[in-house]
């Protein structure tokens, strides 16, 4: 915990309050500087932390139901503080092939290498692969096993206090909590060895992972072999199960991922997104979001 400073906790407060400044709980926390110092003292002294969640079911625009875990703002500040404390080792181990919830990476990222859409276009346009293998982990957050994640933590960090705090904030009653700042980080930590397995063991040159959505490009035989080796690796090493409908597919059928359908020479926005775009275009907030999608195409 030698990196813990009041300035680091202050930065954690800034990070935690982004996009939440209008909430009463956040306003009350920010009005009293003592709240910030109490978090610093609590972590400095190694005092126990308890994170309580309330749960809310949300339905995404494509009809998918999720249970979101909502914690207090103070708990989110603690999570962001821990994330800053472990940032150096975490960032050093991240693969260049993962793109979600990482600063400087994602759709429309300023650097082409860290934009998954432009990366997929580059792979298809430059290397002309026979086809692709698109994989999705079944209930990734819910099926994450604590003992596996904590073993991954222990392989990276040796500070017992940090490890104990990570154990306290990483899980809720239903697995990795959807909606907390620490969960995407933990999911990447779970998949770090998998990313190396794809590159070093399977020798897959063209690979993109966005959270638990995985796509590999190559020839038919290599993709068939990769499917079964990946399924075995995920199950026996991480306790994850793939959805059953994955199979190598030729590029002429198009690649439907990340809201786009990729073809050799051109890219289209997914049909369901175009239909939602037509219905929501008059809403200025929705329009700006959809303009970002159109920019990617």
Give the role of each language-model region:
Residues 83-145:
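Active-site-proximal segment of RNA-dependent polymerases
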Residues 15-27, 58-69, 96:
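Glycine-/proline-rich flexible loop or hinge segments
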Residues 65-95, 173-201:
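Conserved pre-motif C helix in the palm subdomain of viral-like polymerases
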Residues 1-38:
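Non-catalytic, polymerase-adjacent accessory regions of viral genome-replication enzymes
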Residues 42-64, 77, 158-170:
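Reverse-transcriptase-like RNA-dependent polymerase core
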Residues 44, 71, 76, 80, ...:
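Right-hand nucleic-acid polymerase module
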Residues 36, 43, 118-211, 215-230, ...:
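Conserved polymerase palm-domain catalytic core
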